[in-house]
């Protein structure tokens, strides 16, 4: 991962009296929220939402989240970000190994010790649909 360039090294360009500054901050993968995953994430309490956003930013920059586990039952390369807050445990399931995009498959509040089958099935279904769209 490349370090951000100092301001003097930034690319400057003028078009029609407008100055454009292009700053290379390194490789950052775009993110795509599948199904209702963005709405689900927005439904998290503020602290959990902020932490999940920070962890997703790490993934976009090619870093591992601080607390994660693989989810092979859903698919190859699928991971679960674990967020623990006073309001409870929250999860964001994503895959970052398809093309150059981070796909958020599902976001939810965890209420039992084991991830509920419906949450696993929903994430797996969204993954299958995305893989089919890419063919």
Which positions does each model-derived feature cover?
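Short, surface-exposed charged micro-motifs
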Residues: 93
